[in-house]
């Protein structure tokens, strides 16, 4: 069966969406009407176009954190247009271009229509080598598909044990589904990006403060940012990727007099708004933060009261072994959270609990009962002294005066903060930056005050929905969790268990964000059965044995929450799923019925949502249906007003129980992280292969996609037509590369062919190709073939930016433009131009 049978062809889309598919092929309304005019429906289409709409209140649901409310205009059962819904609350007013293009996501030529089975697959003879771009599929009935999936689950458990099942879900849908409930009931393993993707910064911050998890830490709510006097945006292009939520608050702060510093190697939309742009060399972020600390120490700009009362800066450290002095050596009954400090008034040590201020020495060295001790802050100051701005300026590619200005603004202007995002942690040892900036903010006392900022993601705890035991039902078998960094070995080597069955959803994992893609493809060949549920036929579904067509967000009812604004949205169904697509909830319910858990899933998903709404006093169906969005908490919140979550209740300026990081370019015995220490792998100037691969390679986020979602939307492809390599003209001309030529980007792991684009806003020595493109979008190779899947011992996070490459002009055969009508080669949008239905 061909892909034109597997996917929604252009003619199919037009039949299902009529003129709702306006512009699907990039031709606009008139061409759409002309294409539809192969029957007597053209007149009806025009009449429908001029009719009246029903406005359905729903919401966008990707992993951008927005969950923006949308008005969907429906006529004759078809979506005609999408507009931004405008709630009354200022905290939630902006949508983006992506949300306005959902028409072309619902009525898209890549839509999966029916359940499919790979023709060369059977339970007894899976033939995994037949998976891939050339795999052929045949249509099967839903009952047959669910029977095959359920039988595969039971067979794997029977022959290899319950942990032979692997459940995978990405972040492609922010709604509440039955996925987690089913996997808990059935058991097995689940992979989880808690370790593996974008977790470095949060890990480092958490280790110092005891707060947050492994992603971005808690911070003041966005509506409090207006009180900031200095905002440092570190490694994030908020004004391109998060403007609908975060940008307005930063602009409000600037209008109120705040200084905006942007640390980014690329001149971004956000850098353009800065009072001070620091175009740092990639991988030098910890160097810069330590230089700022050195300046603050040298000029006595640190917050003494905060350091004494809310950090372990005055804690006494043994010089012989680096451990904190034991409180029991000073008093017989020390408080649980006590630290030993030196009281300058009494001239003796004493033990004090958290949140205690007093005449405690911040610096100094003493001998107590024959043991030489110094304060934790003394050790930190000694470490920072090796990184004065004048020395770091050359290392980081910055002006020393600019480093000093940034440090001075942060330390002296009043409350402020540092707003990192995930990009700054996309290096092998990126967690050290998390430790470093958390410590830097402790020096300036920027915790627990109005105007403090600690992350790009504001924290609205009240926006969560209480789901009770829905995701942890009674009698559940439970699942074991493996971070993405361990799943590759799990699949490749069967360590620690043989994995034979995989169910995936909400994810295009093999198209985006899984480095060393070929290793993943090889590892998945050890699976007997791969099942994937998706809206579209993606690079990942092409590796499946059974494909289940999922419904678009506008075809399902759901509730949406997010921790980054104080609102909850109700996703109303605009129309039923097209063709035989199904809401993931009903797919899970169908499997549950076959696996003996049917009684755990109500027949109607609305009954589940009704249970959640009735259990939450803030919500009512009347309000949800009328407005689509309900504000759950609009009170500005200041984070870190209570004791910190560390053992001492204080920020750990000096960590005597620090982990030892091990990995490339580090000593054989590793590096202990009592205080921040700049660690680098491939970004280091003296990296072993730096001469062979002299260019650092980033893959930043694009404002035209959320990961790989929206990569197949024709309207957006008219603007962002194909992958390109941002390269500084100096680097290009040195290699004989003209602007617009196709180039081969390569290293010892792989290569990709893309079009070169001169960009003066990217510094020499650095190149970039935005992430999120599908495999078919590249002329040859793949972006993720270049990235190492190696992770460090402590960080355990994929280091997408820790990558070096060389760039050469591509072969002559690749120099012709292979993109037609804004569609990539091989896409359904192009391949079905002349199809028959």
Curated annotation (Swiss-Prot):
- GO molecular function, one example? oxidoreductase activity
Q: What is its EC number?
A: 1.8.5.3
Reactions mediated catalytically: dimethyl sulfide + a menaquinone + H2O = dimethyl sulfoxide + a menaquinol
Q: Residues that bind Mo-bis(molybdopterin guanine dinucleotide), according to the entry? A: 200
Q: Please indicate if the UniProt record lists Repressor as a keyword.
A: no
The annotated phenotype of a deletion mutant is: Cells lacking this gene fail to grow under anaerobic conditions using either DMSO or TMAO as terminal electron acceptors.
Residues of the region (Disordered) are 813-837
Q: What induces it?
A: By anaerobic conditions. Its expression is under the control of DmsR.
Provide the protein's localization.
Answer: Cell membrane
Query: What does the PTM comment of the record read?
Result: Predicted to be exported by the Tat system. The position of the signal peptide cleavage has not been experimentally proven.
The record's listing under SMART domains reads: Molybdop_Fe4S4 (SM00926)
SUPFAM superfamilies tied to this protein: ADC-like, Formate dehydrogenase/DMSO reductase, domains 1-3
> Looking at the Swiss-Prot or TrEMBL record, what is one Pfam family this protein matches?
Molybdop_Fe4S4
Q: What is its main location?
A: membrane
Record domain 4Fe-4S Mo/W bis-MGD-type: where = 53-110
Question: What is the annotated signal peptide range for this record?
Answer: 1-36
Q: Per the similarity annotation, which family is this?
A: Belongs to the prokaryotic molybdopterin-containing oxidoreductase family.
Task: Explain the purpose of this protein.
Answer: Dimethyl sulfoxide (DMSO) reductase catalyzes the reduction of dimethyl sulfoxide (DMSO) to dimethyl sulfide (DMS) during anaerobic respiration; it can also use trimethylamine N-oxide (TMAO) as terminal electron acceptor. Required for anaerobic respiration on DMSO and TMAO; subunit A is proposed to be catalytically active.
| Record text on subunit structure and interactions | Probable multiprotein complex that likely consists of DmsA, DmsB and DmsC.
Name the chain's protein: Putative dimethyl sulfoxide reductase catalytic subunit A
Q: Which gene encodes it?
A: dmsA
């Amino acid at each position: 069966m061909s892909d034109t049978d597997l996917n929604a062809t252009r003619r199919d889309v037009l039949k299902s969406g009529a003129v709702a598919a306006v512009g699907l092929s990039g031709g606009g309304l008139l061409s759409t009407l002309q294409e539809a005019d192969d029957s007597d429906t053209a007149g009806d289409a025009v009449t429908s176009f001029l009719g009246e709409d029903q406005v359905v209140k729903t919401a966008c649901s990707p992993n951008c954190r927005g969950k923006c409310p949308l008005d969907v205009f429906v006529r004759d059962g078809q979506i005609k247009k999408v507009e931004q819904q405008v709630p009354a609350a200022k905290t939630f007013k902006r949508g983006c271009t992506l949300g306005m293009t959902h028409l072309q996501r619902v009525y898209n030529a890549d839509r999966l229509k029916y359940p499919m089975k790979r023709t060369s697959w059977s339970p007894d003879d899976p033939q995994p080598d037949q998976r891939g771009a050339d795999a052929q599929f045949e249509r099967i009935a839903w009952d047959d598909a669910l029977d095959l999936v359920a039988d595969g689950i039971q067979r794997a458990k029977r022959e290899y044990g319950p942990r032979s099942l692997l459940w995978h879900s990405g972040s492609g849908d922010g709604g509440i589904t039955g996925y987690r409930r089913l996997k808990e009931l059935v058991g097995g393993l689940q992979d989880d990006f808690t370790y593996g993707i974008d977790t470095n910064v949060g890990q480092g911050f958490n280790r110092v403060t005891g707060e947050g998890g492994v992603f971005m830490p808690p911070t003041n709510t966005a509506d409090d940012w207006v009180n900031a006097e200095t905002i440092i945006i570190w490694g994030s292009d908020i004004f391109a990727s998060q403007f609908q939520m975060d940008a307005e608050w930063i602009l409000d702060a600037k209008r109120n007099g705040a200084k905006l510093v942007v640390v980014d190697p690329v001149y971004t939309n956000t850098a353009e708004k800065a009072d001070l742009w620091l175009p740092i060399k990639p991988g030098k972020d910890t160097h810069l933060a330590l230089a700022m600390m050195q300046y603050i120490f040298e000029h006595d700009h640190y917050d003494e009261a905060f350091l004494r009362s809310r950090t372990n800066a005055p804690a006494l450290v043994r010089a012989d072994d680096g451990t904190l002095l034991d409180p029991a050596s000073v008093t017989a009954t020390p408080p649980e959270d006590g630290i030993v400090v030196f009281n300058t008034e009494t001239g003796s040590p004493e033990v004090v609990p958290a949140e205690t201020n007093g005449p405690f020495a911040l610096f100094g060295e003493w001998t107590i009962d024959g043991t030489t001790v110094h304060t934790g802050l003394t050790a930190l100051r000694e470490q920072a002294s090796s990184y004065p701005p004048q020395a770091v300026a050359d290392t980081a590619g910055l002006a020393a005066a600019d480093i000093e200005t940034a440090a001075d603004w942060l330390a002296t202007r009043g409350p402020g903060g540092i707003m990192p995002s995930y990009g700054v942690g996309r290096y092998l040892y990126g967690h050290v930056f998390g430790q470093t900036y958390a410590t830097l903010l402790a020096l300036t006392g920027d915790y627990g005050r109005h105007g403090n900022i600690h992350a790009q993601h504001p924290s609205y705890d009240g926006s969560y929905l209480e789901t009770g035991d829905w995701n942890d039902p009674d009698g559940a078998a439970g699942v074991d969790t493996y971070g993405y960094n361990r799943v590759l070995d799990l699949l490749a080597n069967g360590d620690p268990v043989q994995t034979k069955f995989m169910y995936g959803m909400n994810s295009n994992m093999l198209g985006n964000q899984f480095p060393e893609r070929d290793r993943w493809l090889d590892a998945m060949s050890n699976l007997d059965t791969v099942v994937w549920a998706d809206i579209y036929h993606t690079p990942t579904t092409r590796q499946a044995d059974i494909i289940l067509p999922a419904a678009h967000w506008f075809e399902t009812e759901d509730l949406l929450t997010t921790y980054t604004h104080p609102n909850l949205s109700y996703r109303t169904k605009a129309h039923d799923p097209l063709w035989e697509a199904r809401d993931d909830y009903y797919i899970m319910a169908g499997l549950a019925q076959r696996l003996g858990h049917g009684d755990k899933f109500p027949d109607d998903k609305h009954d589940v949502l009704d249970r959640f709404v009735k259990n939450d006093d803030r919500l009512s169906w009347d309000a949800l249906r009328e407005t689509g969005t309900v504000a759950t908490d609009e009170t500005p919140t200041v984070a870190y007003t209570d004791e910190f979550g560390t053992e001492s209740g204080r920020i750990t300026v000096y960590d005597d129980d620090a982990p030892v990081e091990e990995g490339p370019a580090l000593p054989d015995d590793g590096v202990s992280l009592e205080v921040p220490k700049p660690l680098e792998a491939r970004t280091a100037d003296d990296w072993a292969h730096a001469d062979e691969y002299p260019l650092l390679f980033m893959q930043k986020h694009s404002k035209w996609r959320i990961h790989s979602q929206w990569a197949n939307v024709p309207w957006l492809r008219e603007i962002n037509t194909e992958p390109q390599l941002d390269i500084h003209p100096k680097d290009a001309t040195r290699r004989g590369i003209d602007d617009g030529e196709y180039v081969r980007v390569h290293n010892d792991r792989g290569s990709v062919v893309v079009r070169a684009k001169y960009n003066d806003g990217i510094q020499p020595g650095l190149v970039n190709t935005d992430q999120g493109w599908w495999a078919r979008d590249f002329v040859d190779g793949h972006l993720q073939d270049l990235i190492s899947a190696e992770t460090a011992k402590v960080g355990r996070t994929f280091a997408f930016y820790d990558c070096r490459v060389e760039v050469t002009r591509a072969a002559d055969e690749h120099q012709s433009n292979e993109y037609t009508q804004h569609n990539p080669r091989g896409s359904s949008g192009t391949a079905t131009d002349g199809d028959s239905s």
